[in-house]
């Protein structure tokens, strides 16, 4: 891996923050992202407790990946990407970001997008975790969002300034597994920001140009 991965991730997310200034959080908009499978029926409190436990587990795993000793920055990023790849509903997120554009793509274009998307999106989330790893997670509230999802609102202390607010949108799949379909830090949802950005980019430059850009940024 070339360059300094985490610095490049921070530069990318800095531009996202500027783009997202006027974008409401996903927890408030609650878009209906397509789900590959139906959610299990569960008692509301049981589903909420499971979602809280999953958010805590994912945070702990991310902390281990990003703070391990004796590993390079690139190795830490790779370990963190593995945590996210296992915890995120990448298919749901990837489809949501493409929106209706996916319907016009060829099988080859979809295959390339699906191949490069995991590396691309986990790099963007990596910077959001940089400010919360190793800090205690405090659950403020959790609530059901529709029939399938739970929003877990948490905060992490910051050395200077107020706490960092993080909303975790968790979905329980039919097979019983828990998956994150969005992580919203300080009110900014990469899922929503990138959906708008992808749509505008494709309209101006075409699908192939977007795929080339994602490949380049995933390997940066």
Per-range role (PLM):
Residues 4-13:
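Bacterial N-terminal signal peptides that target proteins for export
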Residues 14-21:
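Bacterial N-terminal signal peptides
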Residues 23-27:
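Sec/Tat signal peptide C-region and signal peptidase I cleavage site
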Residues 36, 40-125:
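Early exported N-terminus immediately downstream of N-terminal targeting peptides
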Residues 102, 119-120, 144-145, 158-159, ...:
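Solvent-exposed loop/turn segments at secondary-structure junctions
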Residues 123-164, 217-220:
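Surface-exposed, charged secondary-structure patches
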Residues 163-192:
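Short beta-strand edge/turn micro-motifs at domain boundaries
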Residues 182-220:
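Low-complexity, intrinsically disordered terminal/linker segments enriched in charged
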